[in-house]
Amino acid sequence: MLKTLRSAIFAGIYIGTAGFGFLASGIQSETYGSLVGAVLFSLGLMAVVGYKLKLYTGTAGFINKNEIGQLFLILLGNIIGCLCLGLMTRVSPMDIQAAAQKVLELRLKTGALRCGLLGIPCGLLMTTAVTFARKGNMLPLLLAVPLFIVCGFT
């Protein structure tokens, strides 16, 4: 249990770092900024897959029925890891607040139901990409992330 939590925390840190890179890359500069950010975000996911860390979105598509209870622990660890990274960004000289605010406002404007529905193709893309990555082919992971971000499936 502790090993799973530790793995999930590190996955959260990697994804938090990827998110920071996404915001810092200039998402506010429309398509090209978000495309660059999406490619940078892929590196965080590649690290999670490469190090075999526990990320909720990468686990949910592969988990057995008898392991469903682990999903809560993984989600908790991911949140802790992201929060740790979020606290570290507070001392960064980069001002990403405006970009983060823009993303948050877009999610709130979209609404929970629509965001949830848009998450379905995101999950399908990521499950497919992770399946390939676990077999040693990282290219689909590199391409799936920009695809779901550019399509707005986040």
Give the positions of each predicted feature:
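Alpha-helical transmembrane segments and their helix-helix packing motifs
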Residues: 1-154
